[in-house]
Swiss-Prot record:
InterPro entries in UniProt: DUP/COS
Topological category with respect to the lipid bilayer: Peripheral membrane protein
Keyword field contains Secreted: no
Effect of gene knockout: Cells lacking all 10 proteins of the DUP240 multigene family show no obvious alterations in mating, sporulation and cell growth.
Keywords: Cytoplasm, Membrane
Annotated compartments: Cytoplasm; Membrane
Protein name: DUP240 protein DFP2
Disulfide pairings: none
Family listed: Belongs to the DUP/COS family.
Main location: cytoplasm
GO cellular component: cytoplasm; membrane
Species of the source: Saccharomyces cerevisiae (strain ATCC 204508 / S288c) (Baker's yeast)
Matching Pfam families: DUP
Entry keyword annotation includes Flavoprotein: no
Length: 74
């Protein structure tokens, strides 16, 4: 609906509309190789120092890409 309104200049928006495959590809490019830290809160006072600040890196592998069966793997 929004795409139709945007294309016919009925509703202007700063957002770009991606097709399903482009959206998925863009999402994978955002998360690939990124390292994230596990959030800590002040309420977790009994957490050992080794547990706080745990980090992990996201690399979308075959299992993750299979969540999107219509997506072509590049």
């Amino acid at each position: 609906m929004n795409k139709y309104l945007f294309d016919h200049k009925i509703w202007s928006t700063p957002y770009y509309f991606y097709c399903e495959e482009d959206c998925h590809r863009l999402f994978l490019s955002f998360i690939e190789g990124r390292t994230f830290e596990k959030p800590t809160s002040n309420a977790e006072e009994n957490v050992q120092e080794t547990e706080a600040g745990e980090s992990f890196t996201l690399n979308p592998g075959e299992d993750f890409q299979n969540c999107f069966p219509r997506q072509r793997i590049l």
